[in-house]
């Protein structure tokens, strides 16, 4: 779809979200939570309203939770990304990593994921799924 322009109304948004949900169900055998992330995290008011009308809720991630694993390692070393994450992540932040990106000359996940988890636990953090996230209140909302 790159380079294409298309306009979706409420029904179109709902169908796109439902299509993704059906695909995840097909792949996993489990019904996914009614959550989505807008492409690039860019959520318009009309998309948010449309999604709510068909039972979906937008979930983004915190700026500190953007772990930078897709950035070039020549400019952003693993040590730099780990330090930035450990300094910036706050309670309730949603973290995101592209664990399948191996284009970095120095791959991120093998070097950073375990020290990040250990470092956050040492700071008193615990880890929850989106279903159990206290600020999202998924159980109450759905």
Feature map (PLM): residue ranges:
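Metal-dependent polysaccharide deacetylase catalytic core of the NodB/CE4 family, i.e.
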Residues: 1-77, 83-102
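Charged helix-capping and loop-helix junction motifs
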Residues: 76-81, 109-113
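C-terminal domain-boundary segment and adjacent tail
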Residues: 104-142
């Amino acid at each position: 779809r790159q380079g294409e322009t298309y306009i979706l109304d409420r029904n179109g948004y709902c169908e796109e979200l439902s299509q993704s949900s059906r695909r995840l169900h097909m792949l996993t055998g489990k019904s996914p939570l009614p959550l989505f992330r807008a492409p690039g995290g860019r959520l318009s008011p009309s998309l948010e309203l449309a999604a709510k009308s068909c039972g979906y809720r937008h979930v983004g991630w915190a700026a500190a939770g953007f772990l930078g694993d897709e950035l070039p390692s020549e400019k952003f070393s693993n040590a730099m990304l780990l330090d930035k994450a450990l300094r910036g992540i706050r309670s309730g932040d949603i973290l995101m990593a592209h664990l399948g990106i191996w284009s970095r000359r120095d791959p991120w996940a093998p070097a950073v994921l375990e020290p990040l988890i250990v470092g956050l636990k040492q700071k008193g953090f615990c880890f929850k799924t989106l279903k159990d996230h206290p600020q999202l209140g998924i159980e109450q909302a759905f």
